[in-house]
Amino acid sequence: MTPAKIRNALLAVVAIALSAAVYLGFQTQTQGISLEAQAQRAIPLATALDNGRPTLVEFYADWCTSCQAMAPDLAELKKNYGGSVNFAMLNVDNNKWLPEVLRYRVDGIPHFVYLDDTGTAIAESIGEQPLRVLEQNITALVAHEPIPYANVTGQTSVVENRTIEADPTSPRSHGNPRPS
């Protein structure tokens, strides 16, 4: 074998090894913090509204890139504040949550609604929020203080404006009512 062929073979092996390492790294990173996994472990909204603790309601969708980007930060917040704050997650693609989508006027996601310990909405923020902002808001929520970053808007994934067809179980209706 010539030196050029040896070099090319080594480069090919290194490229394959690096590609595999990067792929496995991303798979490992996202498995523990996926939106689906967090949603399955989230407090049901009915429980959150009745247990006397303040609540952060997150409206999300699995396809929402902003929601996916925030998943690690929210997992950290849930770990640190889960004993004093309910974390409820409502998927906008599930028509079950249509009343809540309409009540809180969700038209972009992620959409966060801060509820006091009586279940009253006291603030909201829409779009990607830095961990520091979310943490300060949650700290204020627990302390019964004004939410410092209320009504802040960051980058969002738009909830598509679609009408509800005759079959209300359509997963892509996004809860928008049929125009009159």
Swiss-Prot record:
Database matches in PROSITE patterns: THIOREDOXIN_1 (PS00194), THIOREDOXIN_2 (PS51352)
Membrane topology annotation: Single-pass membrane protein
Localization terms from the record: Cell membrane
Transmembrane region(s): 10-26
Coiled-coil annotated spans: none
Disulphide bonds in the chain: C64-C67
GO CC terms of this entry: plasma membrane
SUPFAM superfamilies, sorted: Thioredoxin-like
Single GO MF descriptor: oxidoreductase activity, acting on a sulfur group of donors, disulfide as acceptor
Signal peptide range in chain numbering: none
Keywords: Cell membrane, Disulfide bond, Membrane, Redox-active center, Transmembrane, Transmembrane helix
Predominant location: membrane
Thioredoxin domain ranges (all copies): 34-143
Domain of life: Bacteria
Function: Required for disulfide bond formation in some proteins. Acts by transferring its disulfide bond to other proteins and is reduced in the process.
Family: Belongs to the thioredoxin family.
Protein name: Thiol:disulfide interchange protein TxlA homolog
Organism: Synechocystis sp. (strain ATCC 27184 / PCC 6803 / Kazusa)
Protein encoded by which gene: txlA
